[in-house]
Amino acid sequence: MEYIKKIALYMSVLLLIIFIGGCGNMKDEQKKEEQTNKTDSKEEQIKKSFAKTLDMYPIKNLEDLYDKEGYRDGEFKKGDKGMWTIYTDFAKSNKADELSNEGMVLYLDRNTRTAKGHYFVKTFYEKDKFPDRKKYKVEMKNNKIILLDKVEDPKLKKRIENFKFFGQYANLKELKNYNNGDVSINENVPSYDAKFKMSNKDENVKQLRSRYNIPTDKAPVLKMHIDGNLKGSSVGYKKLEIDFSKGEKSDLSVIDSLNFQPAKVDEDER
């Protein structure tokens, strides 16, 4: 009988050790899973925040934005229908110390159903030289860009009048399929960044290569940046960048943004 008791006690202790060890392993696995879920959930939150506007792409007729409302908060005055700001530029380093930046910004006022903005050409220099900046006023009527300023260069004039925003031909409804992004967060601002590797087979990449001079076969990186609350903020902004750059000293990228804010009355604020 005493022998059987010893065997039973031994088995009980052995089972207890196995159980405690198993619980410890389960806790470790749970911690790992929770940590993974935190990273994944933040990545998903960033993508979902962008999807609120990117799901509208492609916006072939920009005047459709007059009938679309974005995120509203306390910054909006009573009766203000808000304003969409759409922006696209192409940045390219021509030399080691020179960067050219060309694109357009358009402000679509939902109150007046009018769209005004400007086309810009900028050149930045690293050395002791001020940047060159030129702006050409434009407006949009019947989904057509109308140049308001006189432009002597016929090639530039054609680029302005035929300009298309990235949001007019891009299709990012499959954004959820971009996975394993590199996510960074600054809770103090707050700001959120996510990077995803793209493929040259991506239709959006093919579109950009057909529209811009991109002298590299390197597959780009999709960079997503948010300033402000992930749920939405009229004082924050979202920016999308498709980066073809080959190295740290090389700049080659397309930047796109579509944001909704209170309508601005003062033209100087733009």
Curated annotation (Swiss-Prot):
Lipid-modified residues of type N-palmitoyl cysteine are 23
| InterPro entries, alphabetized | Csa, Csa_sf
PROSITE patterns xrefs: PROKAR_LIPOPROTEIN
Q: Which UniProt keywords apply?
A: Cell membrane, Lipoprotein, Membrane, Palmitate, Signal
Q: Name one GO cellular component term.
A: plasma membrane
Range of residues in the leader sequence: 1-22
Q: How does it sit in the membrane?
A: Lipid-anchor
**Pfam families (alphabetical):** DUF576
Question: Which positions are lipidated as S-diacylglycerol cysteine?
Answer: 23
Q: Where in the cell is it found?
A: Cell membrane
Record bears the keyword Transmembrane helix: no
> What is stated as this protein's family in its record?
Belongs to the staphylococcal tandem lipoprotein family.
Q: What is this protein called?
A: Uncharacterized lipoprotein SAS0403
Q: Which organism is it from?
A: Staphylococcus aureus (strain MSSA476)
